[in-house]
């Protein structure tokens, strides 16, 4: 850089001045005399030959370097131009840690005062015998003829005497040579270029030396900075290799070695920074060699320990994964439990030793249960019909009454004269994607997670813990209390065959749902609610829909394993009926379902009817006194007038009615939809309910307030909607009242209830109450469903809590025959 260069072009360093008789100009002679007389940092080797200046001109005191041959060290020293550039700190190339004003404030105290610089210059010229601007007098002619050996001997003798006396004198006078701004050593070097020891001492004087020493002491420990002109000196960049005979430790001053200067990497406690190799390495110039230094380069803290940090970071991550998994697995396999949690607090009085070894880690081990609330955790392996009673209390009470309009459980319910007002617990023990989309949202469409079968496969070993957590949290005791408070009196509980047993190849979580089914029945008992058991998924799948457990092929009464699955489903009912024929259930389980929604549009109708008759006879033979329900199979209700006319007693037909899955009904506007229910559905249900003109006792086991099919996954995972015309891959027709205007949208239909307009809430409640009125003309109804994660128009709980369902189900504000209220300016596109 310009501020650190020298004028090497004026006289080549390779000129052999010793072999010639050069003619010196006064200025050259003066500079040569100056350089030749300072040997403070000379090598001990008199045969040392200088390398080119650009190799080692990085030291702060480089103008004091000397050769064996003073003629080789002739350099032009132009005081007017050598330091034209703005002053730069000598350690700028090394500065990495100290920045800005903080560093600069510390450095400014190290700059010599102008009076000290002037005094140093005066001594230089006085000792050379030139007091003025013209430089020294011409060299005597006989001086040019001196021999090389004699001149060298004289010079070395003078240097040695001067160094010894001056160093001792100034160190004593200054008190601390290493602490002064212009210390004794530095002045010895500066004055070493002058001829005559006595002249130097006489001109210096004791008073001035004391004054300078005092200033140095007041300034504190400062770095030694030579100043040869009005402006401070800049340094060249450090070379990669130090000159032979020099120690690389000269890069830093004594103060830096003791305290560590700016840009130097500090050790943990005390001491200075690393040797020069570390500093040069920091600038990217070090070749890895430590020659010339007695101290090995010390790498940075991160470089020394980064592998250790990485190793421990990996261990921490692995531990964060392994520990929770290990705890869960230990609970499952070895009977450990989070017994301190409130949901497992009843385990505190139970000894783990009370669980037999063969039962530990199984569904019979309460220490592996996610939730033990309201379960009897005393171990038992007793069964009824081959089904465990583990978790049940030995006593019960059937005196509870849901509301004043229905009898308590220990009195018979007047079916036929008193309508059922109930709700389903869909998506709970039989998982449905549209009810609990959170279990499916984390997967991409390419993974094909579309039902409980594929979900269980995907979850693998974690399926039991994930699904049991859903069982324990999606429906709780509070829900049964709310169902009662909403004026409802029946609960239809969905479950599937894997709650009882699984078969080879099944990925389902076996038997855990059974425990939650039994507890749910006990909660119903507590709040006076009667139960309708609903097998939602039977072996092989009865309809191939996702809520049967496995979407796709129907394998029940159909296909290669059709007969096998027929037999399995009968075995299931054999066990179930034996269990629920117990006295403890005769007052609470009052409706017993055979199978949910067998798709009789695809299955052989006669096979379904024969199985229905056989299954009904079986369960009644086993002691079931409850009503047995058979689903209409999606056949027109008028076809049932002639089916199962000679059937077992105490049977009930179950029909499910929705307007959103019928393209002829989903397009109706709000008012017309209410009219459809009160005119068409009302009479249809009323007629089928009469044995003489229809089939006989009929209930509507499923219906909802949904007026669109916009809810996420309601048409299967990844399937579009009829409302927006995305349901079919071949037909883009939009099925909504405003399809001709192109305004069909699911945005408003899927909005949260908090933004519903009063007109929309009025419609939704009127729409619900019209259906209640129609179905109560028969045996009654069960709303689909009680709770959903996000599908607001499918959740009775959401509607009830947000003011678009009657406060009490038995006290609606609208009945068929009443004038349909105005819905205000409610748009028809939602």
From Swiss-Prot:
Regions of compositional bias (Basic residues) in chain numbering: 147-163
One Pfam family from the record: Cellulase
Enzyme Commission number: 3.2.1.58
Purpose of the protein: Glucosidase involved in the degradation of cellulosic biomass. Active on lichenan.
Family the UniProt entry places it in: Belongs to the glycosyl hydrolase 5 (cellulase A) family.
Matches recorded under PANTHER family: GLUCAN 1,3-BETA-GLUCOSIDASE 2, GLUCAN ENDO-1,6-BETA-GLUCOSIDASE B
Protein name: Probable glucan 1,3-beta-glucosidase D
Native organism: Aspergillus niger (strain ATCC MYA-4892 / CBS 513.88 / FGSC A1513)
């Amino acid at each position: 850089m310009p501020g650190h260069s020298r004028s090497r072009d004026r006289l080549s360093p390779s000129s052999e001045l010793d072999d010639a008789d050069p003619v010196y100009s006064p200025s050259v002679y003066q500079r040569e005399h100056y350089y030749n007389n300072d040997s403070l940092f000379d090598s001990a080797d008199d045969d040392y030959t200088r390398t080119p200046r650009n190799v080692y001109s990085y030291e702060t005191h480089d103008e004091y370097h000397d050769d064996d041959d003073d003629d080789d060290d002739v350099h032009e020293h132009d005081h007017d131009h050598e330091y034209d550039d703005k002053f730069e700190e000598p350690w700028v190339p090394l500065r990495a840690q100290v920045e800005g004003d903080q560093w600069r404030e510390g450095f400014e105290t190290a700059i010599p005062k102008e009076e000290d610089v002037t005094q140093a210059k005066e001594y230089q010229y006085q000792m050379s015998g030139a007091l003025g601007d013209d430089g020294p007098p011409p060299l005597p002619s006989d001086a040019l003829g001196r021999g090389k050996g004699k001149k060298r001997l004289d010079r070395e003798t003078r240097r040695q005497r001067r160094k010894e006396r001056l160093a001792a004198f100034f160190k004593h006078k200054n008190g601390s040579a290493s602490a002064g701004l212009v210390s004794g050593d530095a002045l010895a070097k500066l004055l070493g270029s002058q001829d005559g020891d006595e002249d130097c001492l006489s001109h210096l004087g004791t008073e001035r030396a004391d004054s300078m020493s005092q200033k140095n002491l007041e300034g504190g420990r400062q770095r030694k900075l030579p100043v040869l002109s009005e402006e401070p000196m800049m340094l060249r960049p450090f070379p990669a290799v130090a000159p032979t005979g020099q120690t690389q430790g000269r890069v830093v001053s004594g103060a830096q070695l003791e305290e560590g200067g700016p840009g130097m990497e500090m050790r943990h406690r005390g001491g200075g920074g690393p040797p020069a190799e570390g500093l040069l390495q920091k600038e990217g110039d070090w070749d890895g060699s430590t020659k010339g230094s007695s101290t090995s380069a010390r790498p940075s803290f991160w470089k020394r320990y980064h592998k250790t940090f990485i190793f421990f970071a990996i261990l921490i991550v692995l531990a964060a994964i392994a520990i929770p998994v290990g705890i869960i697995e230990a609970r499952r396999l070895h009977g450990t439990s989070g017994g301190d949690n409130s949901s497992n607090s009843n385990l505190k009085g139970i000894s783990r030793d009370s669980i037999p070894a063969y039962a530990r880690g199984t569904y019979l081990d309460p220490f592996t249960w996610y939730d033990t609330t309201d379960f009897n955790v005393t171990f038992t392996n007793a069964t009824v019909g081959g089904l465990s009673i583990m978790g049940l209390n030995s006593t019960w009470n059937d005196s509870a009454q849901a509301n004043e309009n229905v009898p308590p459980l220990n009195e018979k319910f007047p079916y036929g004269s008193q309508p059922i007002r109930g709700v389903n617990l869909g998506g709970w023990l039989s998982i449905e994607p549209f009810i609990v989309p959170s279990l499916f949202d984390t997967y991409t469409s390419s993974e094909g997670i579309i039902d409980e079968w594929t979900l269980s496969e995907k979850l693998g070993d974690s399926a039991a813990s994930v699904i049991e957590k859903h069982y324990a949290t999606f429906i709780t005791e509070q829900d049964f209390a709310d169902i009662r408070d909403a004026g409802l009196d029946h609960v239809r509980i969905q479950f599937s065959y894997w709650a009882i047993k699984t078969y080879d190849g099944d990925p389902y979580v076996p038997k855990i749902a059974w425990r939650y089914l039994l507890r749910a029945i006990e909660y119903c008992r507590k709040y006076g609610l009667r139960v309708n058991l609903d097998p939602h998924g039977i072996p092989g799948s009865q309809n191939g829909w996702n809520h049967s457990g496995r979407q796709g092929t129907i394998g029940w009464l159909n296909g290669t394993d059709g007969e096998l699955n027929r037999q399995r489903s009968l075995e299931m009912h054999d066990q179930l009926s034996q269990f629920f024929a117990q006295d403890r259930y005769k007052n609470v389980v009052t409706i017993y379902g055979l199978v949910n929604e067998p798709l009789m549009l695809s299955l052989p109708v006669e096979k379904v009817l024969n199985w229905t008759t056989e299954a009904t006879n079986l369960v009644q033979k086993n002691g079931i006194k409850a009503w047995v329900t058979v689903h209409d199979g999606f056949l027109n209700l008028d076809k049932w007038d002639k089916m199962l006319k000679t059937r077992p007693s105490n049977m009930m037909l179950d029909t499910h009615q929705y307007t959103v899955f019928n393209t002829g009904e989903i397009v109706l506007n709000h008012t017309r939809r209410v009219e459809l229910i009160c005119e068409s559905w009302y009479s249809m249900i009323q007629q089928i309910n009469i044995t003489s003109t229809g089939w006989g006792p009929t209930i509507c086991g499923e219906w909802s307030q949904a007026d669109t099919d916009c809810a996420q996954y309601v048409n299967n995972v990844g399937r579009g909607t009829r409302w927006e015309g995305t349901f079919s891959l071949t037909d883009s027709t939009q099925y909504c009242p405003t399809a001709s205007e192109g305004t069909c949208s699911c945005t408003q239909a899927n909005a949260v209830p908090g933004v519903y307009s009063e007109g929309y809430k009025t419609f939704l409640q009127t729409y619900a109450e019209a259906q209640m009125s129609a179905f109560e003309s028969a045996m009654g109804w069960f709303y689909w469903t009680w709770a959903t994660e996000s599908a607001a128009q499918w959740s009775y709980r959401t509607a009830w809590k947000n003011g678009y369902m009657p406060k009490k189900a038995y006290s609606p504000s609208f009945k068929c025959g009443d004038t349909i209220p105005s819905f205000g300016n409610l748009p028809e596109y939602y």
